[in-house]
Amino acid sequence: MDLFRVWSGMDFLAWRGMAYTLLLLNFVFACQLLLLQPLVSALDGQSVDAAELFERASQSIKVKRYSDALDDLNAAIEADPALSEAYFKRASVLRHFCRYEDSENSYQKYLEFKSGDSNAEKELSQLHQAKSALETASTLYESKDIAKALEFVDKVVLVFSPACSKAKLLKVKLLMVSKDYSGAISETGYILKEDENNLEALLLRGRAYYYLADHDIAQRHYQKGLRLDPEHSELKKAYFGLKKLLKKTKSAEDNANKGKLRVSAEEYKEAIALDPEHTANNVHLYLGLCKVSVRLGRGKDGLNSCNEALNIDAELIEALHQRGEAKLLLEDWEGAVEDLKQAAQNSQDMEIHESLGKAEKALKMSKRKDWYKILGISRTASISEIKKAYKKLALQWHPDKNVGNREEAENKFREIAAAYEILGDDDKRARFDRGEDLEDMGGGGGGGYNPFHGGGGGGQQYTFHFEGGFPGGGGGFGGFGF
């Protein structure tokens, strides 16, 4: 037990001594660092002098690493304020960034060392041209003179200031107004390669993808921007606007599939109204609205919607098909055949070919005489109504009763008789209603029937007796009896 106490006491004394030793060593090390710091700084300054910084900046400029070059030039000037060439190169780099005021100051500083230097004077003139061109391009953009604005940006500003973010973003805006969305995507790609967190570039690139109807990629750009700045108003507007459009479109499509056609039609209209300029997406919305309108039997609405779709994409086969269906509803047979024939030539879809056959049949039927119309009756008229109409019109247009306009009366009378020959026969009437061809159905009284054929030549008299029947008179009235 006594030995244990002795050992414990010795252990405590040893640990305490070790702790004091470590504290002393740390204190000495800290003092050494403080004493050596000025020497280290001096050595650093000697290791990278102004000339070396200038040379490194020159190499960075060659590979277009302008930000690195600017840092080294600033350091070189700080190390040697009399290094005139550093001012000249810094002025040039600042001009590249379109930091025109700072650039001009550096040129002027260089000219204090090298008064009248032709290269500096030339670049200073280019600076003024670029600055003026950028201001002009901005004004032209505001006044919607897009072509001229692009010319100033491309041919002046970006020639003398190729690293000018302001000019690059202005160019993207001009391309967006010109609806050159692929060009806008390409240009913003260069900007984001240099600065992946450029919020304006993310917004513009997202909008370009949006207007190409590449909504997933557009959404990703908006989301990245909002992660960097959750309160960015334009990014929020673009992001939530896209979400609303997608939601409304899906609802319209779902309701169309469920047969809720009236609701679907209204939702398609609302989706289109959210962004009337979004043609790449609206072409599909107009087509959806056209289909729903045709299913509702709204021929005029369907025609208008499909016209809008075809104004955007004249080769959209399904829009041609649906417009043909809308024209069938409007009884524009020739227009329907034209649209459906064009669609069928570019598609093997059996539904389109069936619709074309239906349209061609309707067109053919429309060119035949409408026997119902000639007798002034409906297509659902009974046989007794047909006979009654025939008797009335035959009496009205009998040539003997129309001596003053005999030729017209004979033509009308012939049509009336032909109409009765078709509609008074159940089989012929059914075939006519189905659109089938009947021999001589539309010509010269139908089936060779001529109420004026019989005894006697021209000028014969026509007599009708309606008592107990309606036989032809002395002029050989074809023997129709009831």
Swiss-Prot record:
Its main location: endoplasmic reticulum. Keywords: Endoplasmic reticulum, Host-virus interaction, Repeat, Signal, TPR repeat. PROSITE patterns: DNAJ_1, DNAJ_2, TPR, TPR_REGION. TPR repeats lie at residues 50-83, 85-117, 130-164, 166-198, 199-232, 245-278, 283-316, 318-350. It is found in: Endoplasmic reticulum lumen. Induction: By tunicamycin. Residues 1-42 form the signal peptide. GO terms for biological process: positive regulation by host of viral process. Gene3D superfamilies: DnaJ domain, Tetratricopeptide repeat domain. Expressed in flower buds and flowers. One of its GO terms (cellular component) is endoplasmic reticulum. Residues 370-436 form the J domain. The keyword Chaperone does not apply. CDD domains: DnaJ. SUPFAM superfamilies: Chaperone J-domain, TPR-like. Disruption phenotype: No visible phenotype under normal growth conditions, but the mutant plants die rapidly after challenges with the turnip mosaic virus (TuMV) and turnip vein clearing virus (TVCV). The double mutant erdj3b and p58ipk is male gametophytic lethal. PANTHER family: DNAJ HOMOLOG SUBFAMILY C MEMBER 7 (PTHR45188:SF2), DNAJ PROTEIN P58IPK HOMOLOG (PTHR45188). Plays an important positive role in viral symptom development and is required for viral multiplication and pathogenesis. Interacts with the helicase domain of the tobamovirus (TMV) and the tobacco etch virus (TEV) replicases. This is DnaJ protein P58IPK homolog. It comes from Arabidopsis thaliana.
